[in-house]
Amino acid sequence: MGVNIRGRSFLTLLDFTPAEINYLIDLAAEFKRMKANGVEHKFLTDKQVVLLFEKTSTRTRCAFEVGARDLGMGVTFLDPASSQMGKKESLADTAKVLGRMYDGIEYRGFKQSVVEDLAKYSGVPVWNGLTDDFHPTQMLADMLTAKEEFGDLRGRKLTFFGDARNNVANSLMVVCSKLGMRFCACGPKELMPSETLVAKCQAVAAETGAEIVLTDDVAVGAKDCDIVYTDIWVSMGEPAELWAKRIELLLPYQVNKELMAMAKPEAIFLHCLPSFHDRETTVGEDIYRQFGIPAMEVTDDVFLGKQARQFDEAENRMHTIKAVMYATLK
C-alpha cells in the first residue's frame, strides 16, 4: 500500500513513520531531477499558501517561496510587522481566518505550541519551518544529502558536535532514530538533549534498530562517524551575552581538521547554516575581537574542504520542502 499523507500537518518527525519519511526524501529527489532537467511540475496551480515568519530566515523562506512557485502555487509572506497574530488577534482566530483563505500554512518562530495550535485551529496542513524545539524540514534536506552520498542510511553514524539541546540536534536524534541510524550527541554534559526526548527516541530506536549515544568525549563522537554535523553555538532569540560562556564550553567541540581526521575517511560534513567559519560577518569579526578566535563551530578549512556538503544541503531544502507541500496538498 502506497504512502498517503494528504491533509496532514508537518510539525515534527515524531509524527511520521520511517516509510513516510523515506517517501518524502525520495519524492524530493524526484523533484530535484525534474528541476535539473527543466521538466515543469506545476501540479498545484489551484492552491495558495501563506508563510508566517516570527524569526528571520534566508534558506527556509527562499525554499518555501521557490518551491511553492515551482508547483504553481500563489504565496503570501507575513512577518510580525505585517500581521496581527498574537497582538490584536488571538492565535486561534488568526488560524481560523488563514485556514479559510489558504490551502496550507508555514510557520517559523519560537514556541512549538504555536505551530501545533495553528494546525489545531486552521483546518489545513501546517508546516513547521523551525521552532525552538524542532526543525523537521531541515532534517529531510540533511537526509537527502546523506542519501545522495551513501545510498542506504541504515547503520550510518551521524554525530552532532556542540549544543545538543537545540532544535537541530533534537530533530537529528528523531530522524536518525526513525531511519535506523546511529546518532551520537557529542558536547558538554550540561548541553545534552532533554531526558524526555531521549526516551522517546530510544523507544523508536528499539523498533528500527537505531542507536542513540550521548557523550562528552570527542574521540567517541568522531570514531567511525559517517556524517559530522554542527550548528552555531547561540541560537536565534538567545542573548549575545551567552557567547563567552558558550565559547568556553563548546570550543573543545569545534569541528576542525583534527576532528575530521578521527572520523571515517569518506565522512562528510554538514551544517544547517548560517555558519561562523570565518571573520566575514559582523558577528564573526566581533567574536574575533573579543575572544581571539577566527572561527567558531567549524574552521574555514573544513567548511571549504572536499568533505563539506553544506551547500548541497542548502539546495536540498528547496526540493524537500517542495515534497512536503506537494504530498500534503495534492
Model region roles, listed by residue range:
Residues 203-299:
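Rossmann-like adenosine-cofactor binding region
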Residues 71, 101, 121-122, 179, ...:
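Short, structured coil segments at secondary-structure junctions
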Residues 98, 118, 220-221, 302:
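Structural alpha-helical scaffold elements that stabilize or flank donor/cofactor-binding regions
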Residues 53-66, 148-231, 236-238:
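Glycine-rich phosphate/diphosphate-binding loop of Rossmann-like nucleotide-binding domains
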Residues 36-38, 42-147, 277:
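Phosphate/diphosphate ligand-binding glycine-rich loop within oxidoreductases
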Residues 286-330:
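C-terminal helix-to-coil terminal segments
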Residues 1-16:
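Generic N-terminal amphipathic, Lys/Arg-enriched alpha-helix
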